[in-house]
């Protein structure tokens, strides 16, 4: 199968990010042209190291650029309590000498977009700081972005504060800018990602699959978004799944605003499902997931990996 969708992946590895990177690399429908890292689950130095370790593990020559170390206006609040201090606890990766590109992520994204023969798809599975910096410094790049598919937000409850999802809450100002940008946005938030559970039976079969399965199984043992006994949530994989299998998702066009001021609500995505605010829709919001179909696709894409 010839890859037909050219993508750039912005990520903050992160254990579920590792699974998403595997899918982006090995799904035959996708052509991953650049990875950029951002501070989120852990510091940007750690997310960059983790992404480089994964690329070395897979012997991949995909270019990687390090991105923003802090949110636009706020100090970083990370999720080491979910992913471990390193961001990818549980597997001993082999040492390597690979380094990131000698330019920041938003410039690397600009360069790839502006040299592409046609608009490309951005996939963001961490805080949206790098995407906001791109749009702030190079607004003309928006014409070269086919769409932005992101893991973030929620139409209901949060997972970082009572109402805010982690990726949006880490940098609400960046997210607010992105949702106001006019880009075509597909939002895979907690409404679907909390459904994207890999069952204990599925997890137990991973080590026999291949090297990638063994590595991910080791990481999942240290992942705190679920457990090996009850199943683990694959938040970030949903964004990759939508690219390849959009029919697994139920989407609704909605106006989405990001709260930046509230003492208790900063980072909340206000998803106007019923159109009460009278604003034009600015995102396609995923609200339901075919869980069985998702698991089947995950098994298929992991089997493509070495």
Swiss-Prot record:
Function per UniProt: Hydrolyzes both purine and pyrimidine ribonucleosides with a broad-substrate specificity.
A GO biological process held by the record: pyrimidine nucleobase metabolic process
Name of this chain's protein: Non-specific ribonucleoside hydrolase RihC
Enzyme Commission code(s) on record: 3.2.-.-
UniProt GO MF annotations: purine nucleosidase activity
Family, as annotated: Belongs to the IUNH family. RihC subfamily.
Source organism per UniProt: Salmonella paratyphi B (strain ATCC BAA-1250 / SPB7)
Active-site positions on this chain: 235
InterPro entries in UniProt: Inosine/uridine_hydrolase_dom, IUNH, Nucleosid_hydro_RihC_nonspecif, Ribo_hydro-like
Keywords, in A-Z order: Glycosidase, Hydrolase
Gene Ontology terms: cellular component: cytosol
HAMAP family in the cross-refs: Nucleosid_hydro_RihC (MF_01432)
EC supergroup of this enzyme: hydrolase
